[in-house]
A protein has these predicted regions:
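Short, charged, surface-exposed loops that flank catalytic or proteolytic processing sites
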Residues: 336-354
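Beta-alpha junction/loop-to-helix N-cap segments that form part of ligand/metal-binding clefts
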Residues: 43-47, 62-144, 153, 215-223, ...
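Periplasmic-binding protein-like
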Residues: 32, 99-112, 132-134, 178-183, ...
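Extracellular/periplasmic periplasmic-binding protein-like sensory domains
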Residues: 253-326, 336-342, 397-424
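Solvent-exposed, acidic/polar segments of extracytosolic/periplasmic ligand-binding ectodomains
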Residues: 28, 282, 360-425
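Extracellular/periplasmic Venus flytrap/periplasmic-binding protein
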Residues: 94, 139-142, 147-255, 294-304, ...
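Extracytoplasmic "Venus flytrap"
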Residues: 31-55, 59, 83-89, 112-113, ...
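Gram-negative bacterial Sec-dependent N-terminal signal peptides
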Residues: 2-22
């Protein structure tokens, strides 16, 4: 009788206990932050949101090619909670706290603005919330502080600036006497120009800075800056403008002849090259912040992603879309590596962090290596080309690629020091 009662109790307990896989199958809540309103929404935020929606839907439906064919993250379905990145950094800090403390998301993936990343990173550390920056470019994130809970799966502005300098030196056959800059007056624009100027002085000794213009972010009107740059008559003009500022700059600078007077570098120009094709003359140097968009490799993941995105939204994915997809896939790779190390059980945040550090993973843009910033900062190759209109369609010509180790500093070395030391490893 004792045995029977014990058996009944055991069977009853088993009947009402949650299945062993329930914790594993509980959905993961991901806070996704990008611009959904304002001047940065159309060229950056909306494409990034669209990419996030595709990735979440397709991962949940096991429709992503290998090595990401497993459902969600390690079998757990993904739930996305969108937050608008518009507004000052103080607003973004409040929204981040809401995601972490009120909504109890498992992780946050987001942020286009370098200012927002700088503001959010210490809060992520304070709240011990796994946070993956997908786009913002300032190298200051991991140069000025060390973070346990923060990762960035896209390269920094240093890569863009060094790559641009290497490209334009070759394009101009070394015949560059003067350079000028028009960049937004905050972390991204400042860092981009500092690294480009320093790189040019290494690659073209004796080059002079004709002028450096730093209008405020989202200023919208740039006639005064354009007049100054035209008057400076620089051989090369560098701009890291993005969002609506980039589009406004193109529309204002083109009719005034800036693109014909100087070789102009638009390090984020890919986001405007299709929309403003008729306003961009041949020969403008176009960047995409890495091997994205027209510079993306011909691999299975890219063929799948670019077709899926274009079929759904009617336009090709721009680099913001690629970077969002890259962040989600990188986080999935880290999660599943941690899960495997945990015997197939749902990993802890510490386990995911350990797996993420120094991780190498594949993306639609090719190989991504988390090897600087103590293993929290990605490096990738990059590419540049010049605009060329072919049968009414904007393309890039004279494409040059630069390996990741050629355009990114080694781990533990600040970008400024690396450049000043002649890019030595």
């Amino acid at each position: 009788m004792y045995f029977v009662n014990k058996l009944v109790i055991a069977m009853t307990a088993a009947a009402f206990a949650p299945p062993a896989s329930l914790a594993q199958e509980a959905p993961l809540k991901i806070g996704v932050v990008t611009f959904l309103s304002g001047p940065a929404a159309s060229p950056f935020g909306v494409p990034a949101r669209n990419a996030a929606e595709i990735m979440v839907e397709m991962l949940n439906g096991t429709k992503v090619p290998a090595p990401y064919a497993a459902r969600g993250f390690g079998g757990a379905a993904l739930q996305m909670q969108l937050v608008d990145e518009s507004g000052p950094a103080t607003t973004q800090v409040t929204e981040f706290r809401n995601l972490a403390q009120r909504d109890n998301v498992d992780m946050v993936i987001g942020y286009v603005s370098s200012g927002n990343c700088l503001a959010v990173a210490p809060v992520a550390e304070e709240l011990k919330k796994l946070t993956v920056f997908f786009d913002c470019g300032t190298p200051r994130i991991f140069e000025e502080k060390s973070y346990k809970y923060v990762f960035r799966t896209a390269s920094t502005a240093t890569m863009d600036s060094v790559g641009a300098a290497l490209y334009v030196k070759e394009l101009k056959a070394g015949k560059i006497k003067s350079i000028a800059g028009v960049n937004q007056n905050y972390a991204w624009g400042q860092d981009s120009w500092v690294d480009f100027e320093a790189s040019m002085k290494q690659l073209a000794p004796g080059v002079q800075v004709a002028t450096s213009q730093m209008p405020k972010l989202f200023a919208g009107q740039y006639n005064a800056e354009i007049s100054t740059v035209l008057g400076a008559k620089a051989d090369v003009v560098h701009s890291s403008f993005w969002d609506g500022d980039l589009e406004a700059f193109i529309l204002q600078a083109g009719p005034r002849g800036l693109f014909k007077r100087s070789t102009v570098i638009l390090t984020t120009g890919e986001t405007a090259m299709y929309k403003l094709a008729e306003h961009i003359p041949d020969g403008v140097v176009i960047g995409a912040r890495g091997p994205y968009g027209p510079y993306a490799p011909d691999n299975e993941l890219n063929r799948w992603f670019s077709k899926t995105f274009a079929d759904r939204y009617g336009v090709p994915p721009n680099y913001a879309a690629y970077q969002m997809a890259q962040a989600i896939l990188g986080t999935k790779a880290a999660w599943e590596k941690a899960q495997a190390a945990n015997g197939g059980k749902r990993p802890s945040t510490d386990g995911v962090i350990a797996a993420f550090e120094r991780l190498t993973f594949e993306s639609p843009a090719g190989k991504v290596e988390m090897v600087i910033g103590a293993g929290h900062q990605a490096i990738t190759e990059t590419a540049y080309g010049v605009s060329k209109l072919v049968k009414g369609k904007m393309t890039v010509a004279n494409v040059k690629r630069y390996p990741a180790t050629m355009v990114n500093p080694p781990d533990g070395v600040k970008a400024a020091d690396w450049i000043a030391n002649g890019f030595k490893k």
